[in-house]
């Protein structure tokens, strides 16, 4: 699911592959910027055909699932689907940022910048993090879609 995360800024598809490494702490340095390298490990490289990012009840503020606070979760009821894990996380980040703006009435930066998304694009070449290059197609309701 898309949610804020203490070490990586947000958790999404890129971060989910951390379960395939024996030493997850090795990937938590520098705001989790090495996460994209996991996608090049033989165990997982080229095996993901479709990325699904749940945005059913996103967490938009806080340290992540271990510090859950119901005030910062909302019923978005969305599902993002993409062949590109970087693009899907970019759009998940945009959703979180839009909700934070709506809730706080101003831009409030995440405690940890989600730099792993751009690094996954620029360094590890996993996809695109530039929202201008992402085709975002919305199906269904548009009320309160935020992005």
Which stretches of residues belong to each language-model region?
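Extended, low-polarity segments enriched in aliphatic/aromatic residues
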Residues: 1-147
């Amino acid at each position: 699911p898309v949610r804020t995360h203490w070490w990586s800024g947000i958790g999404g598809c890129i971060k989910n592959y951390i379960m395939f490494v024996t030493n997850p702490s090795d990937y938590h340095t520098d705001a989790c910027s090495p996460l994209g390298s996991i996608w090049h490990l033989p165990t997982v490289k080229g095996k993901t055909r479709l990325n699904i990012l749940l945005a059913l009840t996103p967490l938009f503020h806080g340290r992540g699932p271990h510090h859950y606070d119901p005030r910062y979760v909302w019923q978005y009821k969305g599902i993002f689907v993409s062949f590109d894990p970087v693009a899907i996380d970019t759009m998940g980040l945009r959703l979180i940022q839009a909700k934070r703006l709506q809730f706080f009435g101003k831009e409030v930066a995440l405690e940890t910048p989600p730099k792993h998304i751009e690094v996954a694009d620029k360094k590890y070449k996993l996809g695109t993090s530039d929202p201008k290059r992402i085709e975002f197609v919305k199906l269904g309701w548009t009320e309160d879609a935020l992005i």
